[in-house]
Amino acid sequence: MNIALGVLVLLNSFIAGTEPRDGSHVRTLDKGLRSVIDEGLARSASFRGLVARLDGSDVIVYVEPECPMSSRLFGRLTLLGAGGDRRYVNVRISCMLPVTQQIAALGHELRHAVEIADAPSVIDDASLAAEYRRVGFASRAARSGAGYESRAAIDAAHQVWVELAHTAE
């Protein structure tokens, strides 16, 4: 946990000067992922809804690409910790996916971030595990065996995918 807090302090210092002008709680420094987020916002009402819920919460989401990512995963979320009146998560999305799959994968991970936002008690790995025993289940896709999944996140990815299929690129 001390390492995560150290990373959190570094991230907070680094990101402080690059906070989005619109104040969004979903942030990235990667130009490609900025385009993915923008396209998700433009083409999917569900994606917009997830971002809006996070923007109204105490959770800040930092989105980064991961290359390569395990072939069993499209994305993953890590709880970085809590500080002050904020909680911080890191989302990594596979850069090997086509843009529409990246948007759907990000929608899935943003739903997990909303689940964290909806549970104020989630402030560390132990409380995250307790919350997912309540709202989700263990994921076999995680390399470390400490991964979690929820039906709501699976459904969110599917809904975003459906909405993307019904809008022009």
Write out the residue ranges for each language-model feature.
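Short pre-active-site segment immediately N-terminal to the catalytic Zn-binding motif
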Residues: 90-106
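Short N-terminal segments immediately surrounding and downstream of signal-peptide cleavage
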Residues: 14-40
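Structural signature of transmembrane alpha-helix termini at the membrane-water interface
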Residues: 7-11, 114, 164
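Histidine-centered active-site/metal-ligand motif
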Residues: 108, 112, 149-150
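Catalytic Zn2+-binding segment of zinc metalloproteases
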Residues: 110-126
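Metalloprotease/metallohydrolase-associated module, dominated by Zn2+-dependent proteases
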Residues: 42-83, 100, 126-169
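Short, charge-rich amphipathic alpha-helices with coiled-coil/heptad character
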Residues: 81-92
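Hydrophobic h-region of N-terminal signal peptides that target proteins for export
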Residues: 2-16
